[in-house]
Amino acid sequence: MKVWMAILISILCWQSSVWAVCPAWSPARAQEEISRLQQQIKQWDDDYWKEGKSEVEDGVYDQLSARLTQWQRCFGSEPRDVMMPPLNGAVMHPVAHTGVRKMVDKNALSLWMRERSDLWVQPKVDGVAVTLVYRDGKLNKAISRGNGLKGEDWTQKVSLISAVPQTVSGPLANSTLQGEIFLQREGHIQQQMGGINARAKVAGLMMRQDDSDTLNSLGVFVWAWPDGPQLMTDRLKELATAGFTLTQRYTRAVKNADEVARVRNEWWKAKLPFVTDGVVVRGAKEPESRHWLPGQAEWLVAWKYQPVAQVAEVKAIQFAVGKSGKISVVASLAPVMLDDKKVQRVNIGSVRRWQEWDIAPGDQILVSLAGQGIPRIDDVVWRGAERTKPTPPENRFNSLTCYFASDVCQEQFISRLVWLGSKQVLGLDGIGEAGWRALHQTHRFEHIFSWLLLTPEQLQNTPGIAKSKSAQLWHQFNLARKQPFTRWVMAMGIPLTRAALNASDERSWSQLLFSTEQFWQQLPGTGSGRARQVIEWKENAQIKKLGSWLAAQQITGFEP
């Protein structure tokens, strides 16, 4: 009893953290938003169950269904029944499908496993559930899961699936099996390939009116043999002998949550013959089948994988000005987890790209991780009923603006500071965007090199800069004075690559100022257009003023 209370508390704590984030909507707005999403999900359900097609990815459907339930709980509506199929022409299951309760995390699974023994882990194969009924050694009936008590008669369809044994013998001759009809895959790696909408594809094949040869692309994974042999090893052996070989191959004994986690991670990265969305842990000891009821299984639980892509709510649209003056758009998100990374922001790109995406606060977007773990937008999966998009700033900035601070230059000025402090430029360790903002807000820099004048006392008394860090920062600023001339020129934003700048052999400011367009044009990777940009840059009044200031500070290469 204590274990169940602990699991319940764990689940409630997790749920409360999700449900607590309720939209700040009026009752009328809430009713409209809930009604619109409810109608859309109902349409998807009708397409799925009546026509066997899906206009939405399985993962997106699941997450938007969960979002709808969250909204309904937030505003006191009755949560919808999830994915309840129509019961036209339904057939009673000899043994009810119980479904499986989902564990929130490894800790919840560990609590569930603590007082249980003889436990086994299987992949949670992603397809559609089915009952197989054998009588006198022959396949007598195949029934879709339906609502767990009744389902559709799939006997004709299943009889055409070559992977399903049509005859069996021994203990299986008069048996009822439960399993998953799945899309057969060759070397499917879940981590890399995701769900590929497998559930909807299988449903589509099973719903088609024609008995297509494509049914042979389906397989079956038996995960339950109600009233079968008591020992799991005996069950697996008999199933394998009958032709259900995958069950024995992918069922492993486990003693604790750590072992489950290892197997789960292994299958997440391994080449498998089917799509999966997690693992199921089940006890070998099961009640008699007459006691099985939908939603009442206490002997098995699931631990699903985190989706490769997550549906996230857009909380705000923000505009950033980079060091070159380009305006980029960033979406601020309600936090989601991707792998082990908490994602709260995603870069949309240019203003034009944002307008093409048509993203507004309140929309639901699908986010995944691209190379090097960078969040990206895959799709806009739901747009809110009321959409207000902010106005982007005027495009008044360019590569030669905001070397000196002003109110309108705030964002580009900070971007320039972040750039010059980066490893590839002046290498100022220990300070990023937040640190630069704190310094500028307190000391009101005149230009991008004003930080060279800060004293240890000023750094120590800067809000947002830890006193223990201020001495290290002052040391970094002093070390920067000894950086090579080319590094300082890069910090000033010269429109050249480092390779081209090094090849120029320019080692002083005066020498650089007298270099001609023809000189720059002969450098590697520098054409006529780039050479003209360099000339425009070095003749800019702000650049000349910065060069004179650095000379007064006796920075290497700038001295008269």
From Swiss-Prot:
SMART domains: LIGANc (SM00532). One of its GO terms (biological process) is DNA replication. The keyword DNA damage applies. It holds the Pfam family DNA_ligase_aden. NCBIfam families: PRK08097.1. Its EC number is 6.5.1.2. It catalyses: NAD(+) + (deoxyribonucleotide)n-3'-hydroxyl + 5'-phospho-(deoxyribonucleotide)m = (deoxyribonucleotide)n+m + AMP + beta-nicotinamide D-nucleotide. Keywords: DNA damage, DNA repair, DNA replication, Ligase, NAD. This is DNA ligase B. One of its GO terms (molecular function) is DNA ligase (NAD+) activity. The active site is at K124. Belongs to the NAD-dependent DNA ligase family. LigB subfamily. Catalyzes the formation of phosphodiester linkages between 5'-phosphoryl and 3'-hydroxyl groups in double-stranded DNA using NAD as a coenzyme and as the energy source for the reaction. It comes from the Bacteria. The gene is ligB. SUPFAM superfamilies: DNA ligase/mRNA capping enzyme, catalytic domain, Nucleic acid-binding proteins, RuvA domain 2-like. The keyword DNA damage applies. It comes from Escherichia coli (strain 55989 / EAEC).
